[in-house]
From Swiss-Prot:
A motif ('HIGH' region) lies at residues 122-132. PANTHER family: ARGININE--TRNA LIGASE, CYTOPLASMIC (PTHR11956:SF5), ARGINYL-TRNA SYNTHETASE (PTHR11956). Its EC number is 6.1.1.19. It is found in: Cytoplasm. It catalyses: tRNA(Arg) + L-arginine + ATP = L-arginyl-tRNA(Arg) + AMP + diphosphate. This is Arginine--tRNA ligase. One of its GO terms (biological process) is arginyl-tRNA aminoacylation. The gene is argS. GO terms for molecular function: arginine-tRNA ligase activity; ATP binding. PROSITE patterns: AA_TRNA_LIGASE_I. Keywords: Aminoacyl-tRNA synthetase, ATP-binding, Cytoplasm, Ligase, Nucleotide-binding, Protein biosynthesis. Monomer. GO terms for cellular component: cytoplasm. The lineage of its organism: Bacteria, Pseudomonadati, Pseudomonadota, Gammaproteobacteria, Enterobacterales.
């Protein structure tokens, strides 16, 4: 149920009947304050200006054509021409019933699209670190939301699995006679990478052999391809452990590494030359883009092939966008890549559009994000100033959560305690990130993220268990409750019901903008409204059975909405804390 969309269409029709153009925007928004109703139409100002009349006068005319019978109990004009809409309690009650009768809580399925989501993208032969966390969990929340809405989502893990470093790694693997690389763990492989690099820098004979191996690998020699595959498999097997711990839906099947596009690069360069978009410049192949200027104010040159014949990330990203449209048949492509890559992506996509590889009707969207900072406001590092490994961060989260839940539940059995600590610890790390606007940097703070108050995972998980506990005490079966009507008489009942019915609107924003923090804010607000409702509208001690069961149904929809909302974020819920 999308009340905002329903009201927007009703107000738009009334505006057209009052003389507004057919493309007018009613600008219906959820009201910021209760006194302004549940929704507010703010579009009169802009339209009245075009019509040469006072906004309030237009609002009055719109009201004469606006039929919200059975939807709103009151509609009024406020200020210079805002239209405040107060939803009818009977309308709310009816739709709460409908939401409870549906597995999807009344959420409609939009027109199905094929959406490619590019996220996570770790590098081969390196362990995942905190720099991979944001892309991985924000991208996964977007994927979960889009899939819930019914879209076909293709996860694309753009792994860094190609490049000159593989010659060096294969040469070192050979030198160490570690043919059985499958048994190596990634922690060893990380040290292995460092040793290989040191050797490469210090031993010219070894470096020369490594360079020859790159050529052999790139020419498709089976022995070198097999060695390369071993390195990729070891890395991704270890990364899968991290994905599983993070409750992220990526699997080995979602790997679409840089190597996938490698065979396409010569054809891309040749085609861009044939189309007159790429030219030779100082031995390299370059595309000059008018949209981007260099320091001298001239069109910026984007290199797609170096003098030595090597290709660049831009070339790969051009091939990648083309592949996603032509082969994967994407209707929309989302990239969860940090904000520092913005200009690079914009340049690659400008070339993609000019070459006609992806039509303008298919959006390529950079859902960029800021950095994770320590309490000192600087990039998050270890005490020694090194990069924090993701596995170490999750270990610490688990350890801190273990202490926290053991303190609150001294008699809980060990296996139950471990399960709860895992849900709280991993949930806390993820929610702390997801609850912030992805476009900004955020401060990583253990105390804040593990707090049981405020917009945190432990608070949300506790809020969910609190609602469930009402049912345990009520001792009523679901069938009995299903037959009971919903009656809304109190203001707090109406406020909670209206917010519950805004779940679909929240999902729609997250799906459109790729902003999971909007879902976090919604769920936190919902938990707060339930708290106020619980305090002021007795449930178990209600004046009669009819009111008791009606309030239990509002509690039931609250629990289902919290659980489903947290699930779209990849946050685990628990039944007891």
């Amino acid at each position: 149920m999308n009340i905002q969309a329903l009201l927007s269409e009703k107000v738009r029709q009334a505006m057209i009947a009052a003389g507004a153009p057919a493309d007018c925007e009613p600008q219906v928004r959820q009201s910021a304050k209760v006194q302004f109703g549940d929704y507010q139409a703010n579009g009169m100002m802009a339209v009245a200006k075009k019509l040469g009349m006072a906004p309030r006068q237009l609002a009055e005319q719109v009201l004469t054509h606006l039929d919200l019978n059975g939807i709103a109990s009151k509609v009024e004009i406020a200020g210079p021409g805002f239209i405040n809409i107060f939803l009818d309690p009977a309308f709310l009650a009816e739709h709460v019933q409908q939401a409870l009768a549906s597995d999807r809580l009344g959420v409609a399925t939009p027109e199905k699209q094929t959406i490619v989501v590019d996220y996570s993208a770790p590098n081969v032969a390196k362990e995942m670190h905190v720099g991979h966390l944001r892309s991985t969990i924000i991208g996964d929340a977007a994927v979960r939301t889009l899939e819930f809405l019914g879209h076909k989502v293709i996860r694309a893990n753009h792994v860094g699995d190609w490049g000159t470093q593989f010659g060096m790694l294969i040469a070192w693997l050979e030198k160490q006679q570690q043919e059985n690389a499958g048994e190596m763990e990634l922690a060893d492989l990380e040290g292995f990478y460092r040793d290989a690099k040191k050797h490469y820098d210090e031993d010219e004979e070894f470096a020369e052999r490594a360079r020859n191996y790159v050529v052999k690998l790139q020419s498709g020699d089976e022995y070198f391809r097999e060695m390369w595959r071993k390195l990729v498999d070891i890395t991704m097997t270890q990364n899968q452990i991290t994905y599983d711990r993070l409750n992220v839906t990526l699997t080995h099947d979602d790997v679409m590494g840089e190597s996938l596009y490698n065979p396409m690069l010569p054809g891309i360069v040749a085609d861009l030359k044939a189309k007159g978009l790429a030219v030779e410049s100082e031995g390299a192949t370059v595309v000059f883009l008018d949209e981007f200027k260099n320091k001298e104010g001239e069109p910026m040159g984007v290199i797609i092939q170096k003098k030595d014949g090597g290709y660049l990330y831009t070339t790969t990203d051009i091939a990648c966008a083309k592949y996603r449209y032509e082969t994967l048949h994407a209707d929309r492509v989302l990239y969860y890549i940090d904000s520092r890559q913005h200009q690079h992506l914009m340049q690659a996509w400008a070339i993609v559009r000019k070459a006609g590889y992806v039509p303008e009707s298919v959006p390529l969207e950079h859902h960029m994000f800021g950095m994770m900072l320590g309490k000192d406001g600087k990039p998050f590092k270890t005490r020694a100033g090194g990069t924090v490994k993701l596995a170490d961060l999750l270990d610490e989260a688990l350890e801190r959560a273990r202490r926290l839940v053991a303190e609150k539940n001294p008699d809980m059995p060990a296996d139950e305690l471990e399960k709860l600590a895992n849900a709280v610890g991993i949930g806390a790390v993820k929610y702390a990130d997801l609850s912030k606007n992805r476009t900004t940097d955020y401060i990583f703070d253990w105390d804040n993220m593990l707090a049981f108050e405020g917009n945190t995972a432990p608070y949300m998980q506790y809020a969910y268990t609190r609602v469930l506990s009402v049912f345990r005490k009520a001792e009523i079966d679901e069938e009995q409750l299903a037959a009971a009507p919903v009656i809304i008489r109190e203001d707090r009942e109406a406020q909670l019901a209206a917010r519950l019915l805004q779940f679909e609107e929240t999902l729609t924003v997250v799906a459109r903008e790729g902003t999971p923090h909007v879902m976090c804010a919604y769920l936190y607000d919902l938990a707060g409204l339930f708290s106020g409702f619980y305090e002021h509208c007795p449930i178990l001690s209600a004046e009669n059975e009819e009111v008791r069961n009606s309030r239990l149904k509002l509690a039931q929809l609250t629990a289902k909405t919290l659980k489903l909302g947290l699930d779209t974020l990849g946050i685990e819920t628990v039944e007891r804390m």
